[in-house]
Regions:
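Bimodal "functional hotspot" detector
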Residues: 1-152
Length: 152
């Protein structure tokens, strides 16, 4: 019995084309850039507990990764049952790194205590802890509020 391969050519062509599209799709999926992975630590509404939130931050052409990270951290968590580090409305006036030290200047809005916000000193400590854990090259974090050193 002789097999006529000519009648199977359309089937083989369809299979090969499908495989090519599948491989191209897998390639695009593997190349997809989600951004750099960061772990944010936020205080939980249950006293003494913390919530870890993973975020992928893409490169921002207008900011350094550190500045972008600090902005996201000050905005707060996207998860329920977490407290804010600082009063909503607090802004990062400036954030830069020099010789493995980060200098952050926060707006004066930080001094107004709001609902569901940790104490200012605890918020600053968590800010420092978040930066030190996610940016291992940083050795020290200096925080200023409206241009004045925080907790002098």
């Amino acid at each position: 019995m002789k097999i006529d391969f000519k009648k199977y050519i359309p089937v083989f062509s369809a299979i090969i084309i499908s495989l090519v599209f599948l491989l191209i799709s897998i390639g695009f999926y593997a190349k997809k850039n989600y951004g750099t992975k960061y772990v944010f630590i936020f205080p939980c509404v249950d006293e003494g507990k913390y919530v870890l939130e993973t975020r992928y931050l893409k490169e921002n052409p207008n900011k350094s990764q550190l500045n972008y990270f600090v902005d996201e951290l000050v905005l707060g968590s996207g998860l329920e049952r977490t407290k804010y580090l600082f009063t909503p409305g607090t802004k990062v006036i400036s954030c830069f790194e020099r010789d493995k030290t980060v200098f952050i200047d926060l707006s004066a809005d930080i001094i107004y205590m709001g609902h569901n916000v940790v104490q200012i000193k605890n918020g600053i400590e968590l800010l420092k802890q978040n930066i030190m854990k996610n940016f291992t090259n940083i050795e020290q974090v200096q925080v200023f509020v409206d241009g004045k050193y925080a907790f002098e």
